[in-house]
Amino acid sequence: ITPQMRPVFHLTPRVGWMNDPNGFSYYNGAYHMFYQYYPYRPFWGPMHWGHAVSKDLLHWNYLPAALAPDEPYENGGGCFSGSAIDLADGRQLLVYTGVLSEKQPDGTMHDVQQQCVAVGDGVNYEKCENNPVMTAKQLPSDSNRFDFRDPKVWKAADGSYRCVMVNCDNKGDGRAVLFESKDGFSWNFKAEVAVLLEEAVVD
C-alpha cells in the first residue's frame, strides 16, 4: 500500500496479508496487537502472528512476527487465533490454535486443531516444549477433534488461569468448553459452559 492510500486509523501490515486481531493486550507500558499474518504474499498462506505495539493506539511500531509455523504441530496451516495474558513472573503468555495435518484411519488427511502456548518479553517469544497443551483428547468422548479453536484466556480471582474455546460434538452442534490451569502451561478440561442447540440457531 502506498503511504497515500494506507489507512490512518486502522492498523495495516507493512507487507503481506492480515486477518483476525489476536492477543490485544496492555503489557510493559504499551498496547500490543497481534494479528493473523502471512508476510510473504498479499493473500492467504501459512498463518503467522504479526505484532505491533503502540503507546496511544494511533501510532504503531512494527515488531518481528511473534509466531511462525515452524513446529510439526502447526503443519496443517500455521498458528491461528488466540489471546494473551501476563504471567506472575512478568512474562507474557500467548495462547493460540495450532493446526496439525493428520492421517485418519481411512487414509485421508485432516486438520486437527489443538491449543499451544508461547512465552516472551513483549518482543521475542518462545514456544513451550510440551505443546500442544490442550488437545481434543481431553474433551468429552463425543467431541469433534477438527473443530476446537480460538482460545480466550484470563486470570481467575485465585490467581489460576481459565481458557474458553469453541468446539462442536460429532453431530455438529456447537458449544464452548472451559479449561483451567495453575500456571498457564499445564491445562485440564473443566466443563462445557455453553451448548448451541439446533432449535436455538437463527437462520
Language-model regions, residue ranges each:
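Beta-rich carbohydrate-recognition and catalytic domains
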Residues: 1-150, 155-203
